[in-house]
From Swiss-Prot:
The species this protein was found in: Chelativorans sp. (strain BNC1)
Keyword Cytoplasm belongs to the record: no
Protein family according to the UniProt entry: Belongs to the TrpC family.
Pathway per the UniProt entry: Amino-acid biosynthesis; L-tryptophan biosynthesis; L-tryptophan from chorismate: step 4/5
InterPro entries: Aldolase_TIM, Indole-3-glycerol_P_synth, Indole-3-glycerol_P_synth_dom, Indole-3-GlycerolPSynthase_CS, RibuloseP-bd_barrel
Matching Gene3D superfamilies: Aldolase class I
Catalysed reaction, written as an equation: 1-(2-carboxyphenylamino)-1-deoxy-D-ribulose 5-phosphate + H(+) = (1S,2R)-1-C-(indol-3-yl)glycerol 3-phosphate + CO2 + H2O
EC annotation from Swiss-Prot or TrEMBL: 4.1.1.48
The protein, known as: Indole-3-glycerol phosphate synthase
Entry keyword Zinc: no
Keywords: Amino-acid biosynthesis, Aromatic amino acid biosynthesis, Decarboxylase, Lyase, Tryptophan biosynthesis
Record-level GO BP terms: L-tryptophan biosynthetic process
Pfam family of the protein (one): IGPS
Amino acid sequence: MADILRKIEAYKREEIAAAKQALPLAEQAARARDAAPIRGFAAALRSKHAAGQFALIAEVKKASPSKGLIRADFDPPTLAKAYEDGGAACLSVLTDRPSFQGAPEFLTAARAATNLPALRKDFMFEPYQVFEARAWGADAILIIMASVSDDEAINLSETAGELGMDILLEVHDEAELERALKLPSPLIGINNRNLRTFETTLETSERLAPLVPEDRVIVGESGIFTHADCLRLKKVGISTFLVGESLMRQNDVEAATRSLLGLQRNIEAVS
């Protein structure tokens, strides 16, 4: 996986350099500061918890490196609205093109179709990308601790903080968790996918969750397919989940979202 991350970083650095040539940092930062007002990402998750519900970060995801094309009829606004109607708290939208067939316009369009906060799901290395994310409408960013140094994580975190954005810190093991807990973000994502084998097991969340202080919000990532999986993770204090592929493969995304969350469809009285 280290080799894969190095390849990803290499093409990302090239992307960033090209983007800076097309739109210098100062101009990108200005666009970020003129973007639509922030929607509170962490606040939306906590609001669901306060109502006694699971909080879902629903992912708009066309493809992945390991699975290839996930959804052929891919329309981000329609999918985002289905997630919102199904009870999701927030959106996660892939913007990485080479590995996930993502795009900035997917993020902008998905967010515009709903009232939900949105996270830019990408491999983040430089503050320039944070300004990009905000300019495109993102309310939060992802920092994958396995792919950045401590200094890079701090720089990304500080830039996001200056823009009022929330940050999801993704970890895969104890060492990454220890590093993430030194950063101020309350959102700790535990990815259940093994970076070496690509296998997923909820035991990763069950092992790491007890190590996370109670004032942080733990987000379970990968390997979550059913309401039973949500209930299993609730036993170790996880009530927030990031789910993409399993929902993207369903014909009725709204119904699948409700089923995952254990919500019943609202039935309006007919007078």
